[in-house]
């Protein structure tokens, strides 16, 4: 160091010393300015520089841990294939392999603190590193625990030694893999394996959850070997609904169960509800199984369905109101009415005619356009009595004619009877008395005033008796009133002409020209 630089350094050092507060150690130093003081300052400066250089060197060339040395050695030498990584239980317990936390260099640290010393000599060659690793492997292993252990994975580049083989022999092995073409599950990177970032190797200990899972896997009992079965027996989880439906169909005995499904149920276990899903089955085999089961159920004979019994036939016979337990179907219908009623000249009506006449007037149940005016379609006042109506009315007349009319000989008549105003014509036996007419017409439930008007319209003799034509016209007017027609002021001659025919003889009508 030349004089110029030395003088500059002395001046700087003198300035820093002047700025620094005086301490206890500087009390014994000689006064500045003398030769002795300059020598002391130079010696102190050189000592301080040496300490700073040694500190920088220790901070820059910090000894690397053995893991970094092993990683550097792995990069230099080709990797040796290792079949299975071996876990050592006591490897982390050695103080040599524990990774020391780097102590950050602090420029403000006091100079009197002890300096860190390197653990390993960084100039050691590869043989020294291998020897160190072998020494660590030769540590005694005393019954490593299964559930709680601190494993440290061996680097993949280190050769396999007989000690490692003995340790791996004592480790319990997992059960053998199942047969059935199961796909290998990709191994997830465990925390115990070394992770290399940027050429450096770091070790991370296993967590409690990982150790518990490992212990549970090792404590699980071995499963029995599955018998040889076709690959169709495996059922993917995507088609479980179809197979469950097929299984329910076999329970109902509607179709024989598929042999593929039965075989899969036998292989899976005694319980038919538990289906073993294997992810190793391809989609083609599963589709073949579904098609086979559907064909088997389709070709199976369906259950015989017997038709329901026919309903019992209804009895056409009508039950009597007086005798509800007896039916009139067995006894033939009598052509004559009951004995309490008087016989008429009219024969009993047939059932077919009554039904035809009943349906004749009820063709249109729903009236179309009820408020529309149909002048030409409406039924006008009837100008004549039909043959059917005349026969019905003549039957009532024949049953009631001559009632309550006294019949006496002319010789037996007294003078008082001859002089009386009450005299009947000789044909009174063919007429109906007014009392009988009132009793018959009152059954129509028409007002007495309407019945009186009808009597006045048909009573042409004014003797209290009605002939056959008068009685028939009166009955016809009652029916017209019940149908809604108004009573005429005078009965037209066409109505009288229609009822003048001989009873029982039909006179054909002459067409008008």
Swiss-Prot record:
GO terms for cellular component: cytoplasm. SUPFAM superfamilies: EF-hand. Residues 90-103, 199-211 have a biased composition (Polar residues). CDD domains: EH (cd00052). Keywords: Lipid metabolism. GO terms for biological process: lipid metabolic process. Residues 1-23, 128-140, 217-228, 237-248, 374-383 have a biased composition (Basic and acidic residues). SMART domains: EH (SM00027). Positive regulator of phosphatidylinositol 4,5-bisphosphate turnover and negatively regulates signaling through the cell integrity pathway. Involved in rDNA silencing. Residues 359-373 have a biased composition (Basic residues). Signal peptide: none annotated. Pfam families: EH (PF12763). This is Increased rDNA silencing protein 4. The gene is irs4. It comes from the Eukaryota. Belongs to the IRS4 family. Residues 412-502 form the EH domain. Residues 67-77, 296-305, 327-340 have a biased composition (Low complexity). It comes from Neosartorya fischeri (strain ATCC 1020 / DSM 3700 / CBS 544.65 / FGSC A1164 / JCM 1740 / NRRL 181 / WB 181) (Aspergillus fischerianus). Residues 1-383 are annotated as: Disordered.
């Amino acid at each position: 160091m030349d004089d110029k630089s030395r003088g500059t350094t002395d001046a700087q050092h003198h300035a820093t010393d002047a700025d620094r507060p005086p301490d206890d150690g500087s009390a014994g130093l000689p006064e500045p300015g003398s030769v002795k003081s300059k020598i002391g300052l130079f010696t102190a400066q050189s000592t301080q520089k040496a300490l700073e250089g040694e500190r920088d060197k220790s901070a820059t060339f910090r000894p690397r841990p053995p893991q970094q040395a092993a990683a550097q050695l792995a990069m230099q030498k080709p990797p040796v294939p290792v079949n299975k990584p071996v876990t050592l239980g006591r490897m982390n317990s050695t103080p040599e392999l524990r990774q020391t936390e780097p102590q950050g260099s602090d420029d403000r640290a006091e100079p009197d603190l002890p300096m860190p010393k390197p653990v390993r000599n960084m100039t050691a060659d590869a043989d020294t590193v291998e020897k160190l690793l072998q020494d660590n492997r030769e540590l005694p292993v005393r019954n490593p625990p299964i559930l709680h252990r601190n494993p440290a994975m061996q680097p993949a580049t280190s050769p396999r030694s007989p000690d490692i083989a003995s340790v791996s022999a004592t480790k319990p092995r997992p059960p053998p893999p199942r047969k059935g073409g199961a796909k290998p599950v990709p191994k997830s990177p465990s925390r115990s394996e070394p992770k290399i970032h940027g050429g450096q190797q770091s070790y991370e200990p296993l967590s409690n959850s990982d150790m518990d899972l490992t212990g549970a896997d090792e404590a699980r009992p071995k499963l029995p070997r599955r018998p040889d079965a076709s690959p169709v027996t495996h059922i993917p989880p995507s088609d479980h609904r179809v197979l469950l439906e097929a299984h329910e169909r076999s329970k109902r005995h509607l179709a024989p169960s598929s042999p593929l499904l039965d075989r899969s149920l036998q292989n899976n276990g005694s319980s038919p509800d538990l289906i073993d899903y294997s992810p190793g089955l391809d989609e083609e085999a599963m589709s073949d199984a579904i098609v086979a089961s559907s064909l088997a159920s389709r070709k199976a004979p369906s259950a015989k369905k017997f038709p329901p019994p026919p309903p019992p036939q209804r009895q056409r016979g009508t039950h009597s109101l007086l005798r509800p337990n007896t039916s009139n179907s067995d006894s033939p219908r009598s052509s004559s009415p009951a004995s309490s009623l008087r016989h008429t000249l009219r024969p009993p009506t047939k059932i077919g005619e009554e039904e035809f006449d009943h349906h004749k007037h009820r063709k249109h149940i729903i009236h179309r356009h009820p408020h529309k005016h149909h002048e030409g379609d409406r039924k006008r006042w009837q100008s004549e009595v039909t043959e059917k109506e005349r026969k019905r009315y003549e039957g009532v007349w024949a049953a009631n004619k001559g009632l309550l009319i006294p019949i006496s000989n002319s010789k037996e008549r007294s003078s008082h009877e001859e002089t009386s105003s009450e005299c009947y014509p000789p044909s009174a036996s063919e007429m109906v008395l007014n009392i009988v007419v009132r009793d018959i017409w009152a059954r129509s439930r028409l007002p007495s005033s309407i019945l009186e008007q009808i009597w006045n319209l048909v009573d042409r003799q004014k003797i209290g008796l009605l002939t056959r034509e008068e009685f028939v016209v009166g009955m016809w007017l009652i029916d017209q009133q019940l149908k809604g027609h108004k009573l005429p002021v005078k009965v037209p001659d066409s109505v009288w002409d229609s009822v003048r025919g001989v009873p029982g003889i039909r006179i054909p009508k002459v067409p008008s020209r």
